[in-house]
Curated annotation (Swiss-Prot):
The keyword Hydrolase applies. Pfam families: Pep_deformylase. This is Peptide deformylase. Its EC number is 3.5.1.88. The active site is at E134. Binds 1 Fe(2+) ion. The gene is def. GO terms for molecular function: metal ion binding; peptide deformylase activity. Belongs to the polypeptide deformylase family. Fe cation binds at C91, H133, H137. CDD domains: Pep_deformylase (cd00487). The keyword Hydrolase applies. Keywords: Hydrolase, Iron, Metal-binding, Protein biosynthesis.
Length: 168
């Protein structure tokens, strides 16, 4: 297992759509393991492959506070969603930045697991939000895209200052 470098906002990989995973092989399994290690070491609850520079449609998630319920989702998709709610969220690609995002409270998502089996998951609340956030990454959409212009511009301005200071 190896810890991977998380791409920060401004990296072109975050704005490119990921391609479907066509084969689940040892490379994908090892990458999933590395992504989980990276996510846990960064105190995250989700990590999408584009966030580590891999433009493939898969992500890892674990919203369990004890970090004992990892989910590896290959080619995930939202099947349905209901009851939108607004809540604060952040992102490992935006360390230290947060914003209120409107997402479905309840969703059904489909994905392929590491054994090649098609799965469906009914998710609520925090897990539902995390799934939507990670699947957005696969479509090159970031949480700041949901924010009002003034908030997004404020975050971008602060990031620009951090880059100038060498802190990004």
């Amino acid at each position: 297992m190896a810890k991977l470098k998380i791409k920060k906002y401004g990296d072109p990989a975050l704005r490119k759509r990921a391609e479907a995973v066509s084969e689940i092989n040892e490379i994908i399994k090892e990458l999933a393991s590395d992504m989980l290690e990276t996510m846990y070491s960064a105190s995250g609850v989700g990590l999408a492959a584009p966030q580590v520079g891999i433009l493939l449609r898969f992500c890892v998630i674990d919203v369990d506070p004890n970090k004992k319920s990892p989910i590896v989702m290959i080619n995930p998709e939202i099947i349905s969603g209901e009851n939108k709610i607004t809540a604060e969220e952040g992102c490992l690609s935006f360390p230290g930045f947060y914003g209120n995002v409107n997402r479905f409270e309840n969703i059904i998502a489909g994905y392929t697991d590491l054994n090649g089996n098609r799965q469906e998951i009914k998710a609520q609340n925090f897990l539902a939000k995390a799934l939507q956030h990670e699947i957005d990454h696969l479509d090159a959409k970031l949480f700041i895209d949901y924010l009002p212009d003034w908030k997004r511009e404020s975050i971008e301005k602060k990031i620009k200052r951090k880059k100038k200071a060498g802190d990004w």
